[in-house]
Amino acid sequence: MKEYIERVTDGDDLTQAEARAVATTVFEDATEAQIGALLTALRAKGETEAEIAGFAEGMRDAARTIRPDREGLVDTCGTGGDDYNTINVSTTSAIVAAGAGVPIAKHGNYSVSSSSGSADVLEEVGVDIEAEPPDVEETIERDGIGFMLAPVFHPAMKAVIGPRQELGMRTVFNILGPLTNPADADAQVLGVYDPDLVPVMAEALARLDVERALVVHGDGLDEIAIHGETVVAEVTDDRIAEYTITPEDMGLETRDIEAISGGSPEENAADLRGIVTGDVTGAKRDIILANAGAAIYVAGVADTHEAGVEQARQAIESGAAADKLDDLIGA
């Protein structure tokens, strides 16, 4: 560990295999001082795509994993940290996408950058967010949707809680969550808080052999935006295509970002329920359509973003999205 800390401090990059080995040491027997020194040195140097992928592999190695018997699993987990207090976009979008027939293995945690994270809002609507891995696996196989709470599936992360809190700055662990789905999702929509992270995370996903993914940053949001342009890196096998999309490209209209503001877990839970049942419309519904449509598209169920949006709309209007919320609550 000391050798790796010295190398990173000197500005040397680690290989993917070395980063994986370092992550294993961090989780198993590194001291808090060593962990803090390593994370600080990596932050100062700047983490490479290979290092990020290697750390993700090490985190996956230490995780409690599941393998649901479902083809084409999709995750909609973002990094958080965009400093906008919006409604719970990725969580609600996952439920709507499931209503459109996309099998969802949703990975998430409590709030990072808003007053209500995926775990906060799902707990508020009545989901058993602390379900054990075998139970979540069964739920995904039966209902086509399940939620995996990060602390339940990644207990080894306890080793880095102290150093991260004491450092008080972003580290590589702030971006690893979306790369470490415990169900080994085949495809995902991954939102990032910084547009500079779009190509970096896309390359990391390619190194991790994801089948298909969209890495997105929407004009300040770690989501696909309806208030402006979204930068996208689409990963397909080893190919990465970068492009931008606007609300109009998806058959939607541009909205004010203030119109998608969130609130407390109780308020966001009410919005989630209202959107999936069709009672909440306007901008809040539109941003869910945009992001659920992306999940439907990346799953291969729709051929374009716009077609995905239309299928998301149909999932809400038919009651299928509300049925998936009921399945998740009743699991």
From Swiss-Prot:
Its GO biological process annotations read:
L-tryptophan biosynthetic process
Q: List residues binding 5-phospho-alpha-D-ribose 1-diphosphate.
A: 78, 81-82, 86, 88-91, 106-114, 118
Record's cofactor remark: Binds 2 magnesium ions per monomer.
Q: Specify which residues bind anthranilate 2 according to the UniProt entry for this protein.
A: 164
Q: Pfam families from the entry? A: Glycos_trans_3N, Glycos_transf_3
Q: Which domain of life is it from?
A: Archaea
Which pathway, metabolic or otherwise, does it act in? Amino-acid biosynthesis; L-tryptophan biosynthesis; L-tryptophan from chorismate: step 2/5
Q: What is its EC number?
A: 2.4.2.18
InterPro entries from the entry?
Anthranilate_Pribosyl_Tfrase, Glycosyl_Trfase_fam3, Glycosyl_Trfase_fam3_N_dom, Glycosyl_Trfase_fam3_N_dom_sf, Nuc_phospho_transferase
Q: What does this protein do?
A: Catalyzes the transfer of the phosphoribosyl group of 5-phosphorylribose-1-pyrophosphate (PRPP) to anthranilate to yield N-(5'-phosphoribosyl)-anthranilate (PRA).
Q: How does it assemble?
A: Homodimer.
According to UniProt, the name of this protein is Anthranilate phosphoribosyltransferase
Protein's organism: Haloarcula marismortui (strain ATCC 43049 / DSM 3752 / JCM 8966 / VKM B-1809)
Q: What is the lineage of its organism?
A: Archaea, Methanobacteriati, Methanobacteriota, Stenosarchaea group, Halobacteria
